From Swiss-Prot:
One term under GO cellular component: plasma membrane
Protein name per the record: Small toxic protein ZorO
Entry keywords, A to Z: Cell inner membrane, Cell membrane, Membrane, Toxin-antitoxin system, Transmembrane, Transmembrane helix
Record's bilayer topology term: Single-pass membrane protein
Keyword Cell inner membrane recorded: yes
Induction description: Expressed during exponential growth in rich medium and at lower levels in exponential and stationary phase in minimal medium (zorO mRNA cannot be distinguished from zorP mRNA by these assays as they are practically identical). Translation of this mRNA is repressed by secondary structures in its 5' UTR and partially by OrzO sRNA. Processing of the 5' UTR increases its translation in vitro and comparative toxicity in vivo.
Coarse class of the protein's main subcellular location: membrane
Biotech exploitation of the protein: A short internal peptide (AARL, residues 20-24) is toxic against B.subtilis, S.aureus and the yeast Candida albicans but not against E.coli, green monkey (Vero) or hamster cells (BHK) cultured cells. It functions in various growth media and might be used as an antimicrobial peptide. The intact protein is not toxic under any tested conditions when added to growth medium.
TM annotation in the entry: 10-27
Length: 29
């Protein structure tokens, strides 16, 4: 696995975490 693919995978994982956090915050309101 080259570094570009690795960076993309990490980026997607971080974005998914952010979306999940936003959904949680939205539910807690």
């Amino acid at each position: 696995m080259d570094t570009l693919t690795q960076k993309l995978t990490v980026l997607i994982a971080v974005l998914e975490l952010l979306v999940a956090l936003l959904r949680l915050i939205d539910l807690l309101k």
